[in-house]
Regions:
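Amphipathic alpha-helical "coupling" segments that flank catalytic cores
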Residues: 1-181
Length: 181
């Protein structure tokens, strides 16, 4: 799904479709290594080094470590096109997947860090001054899950994710003392 989403987003971001799809397809490859299994904080970091040792281009390798960014509300963002595109599609894929099975954050619990993912998507778009058709990206992500015959428990996923993103956007604006009107 990440590979297909990255290809879809590449048109909006005007980046090389084939390269970003390669980056997406190897973005999680280090998660099955014993080292990352033992030291989860090395996810992405080791992926970058594994990719470099396998001869992948530096910008593709960097996207593996950078796509986990941002880690919080004020932390560093991915700044390179492959990195921020993989970061956006990874976070969209997670949001869509969890919303499809009705695993949404509540006022007191967010065990899958979906609020952080949503804020990350918005910060990446805003701070990198990107033009992304989020509605289209979310719709395409839902279709990819449907094609895999994933049991969909929530038929309102697209609307709910857009509302969820709007609420996170309100929070971002509030923190920056920008009026919502």
């Amino acid at each position: 799904r990440l590979r297909q989403l990255a290809g879809f987003l590449s048109d909006d971001l005007n980046i090389n479709k084939e390269k970003v799809q390669v980056a997406a397809s190897i973005s999680k490859s280090d998660l099955c290594s014993d080292l990352v299994g033992e030291y989860p904080e090395l996810q992405g970091v080791m992926g970058k080094y594994f990719a470099l040792s396998q001869g992948f281009e530096e910008e593709v390798a960097n996207s593996i470590s950078d796509h986990y960014l941002p880690l919080g509300l004020t932390s560093a963002l991915p700044k390179k096109p492959f990195s921020y595109s993989i970061s956006i599609v990874d976070k969209i894929d997670s949001l869509v997947g969890f919303f499809l099975i009705n695993e949404k954050p509540t006022s007191s619990k967010d065990p899958f860090a979906l609020r952080r993912a949503a804020i990350g998507i918005l910060r990446i778009i805003i701070e990198n001054k990107l033009s992304v058709k989020l509605r289209d990206l979310i719709s395409y992500s839902v279709r990819l899950y449907e094609e895999q015959e994933i049991k969909i428990e929530n038929k309102n996923t697209e609307i709910e994710i857009l509302d969820f993103l709007k609420e996170r956007m309100r929070n971002i604006l509030k923190l920056k003392n920008i009026k919502i009107d």
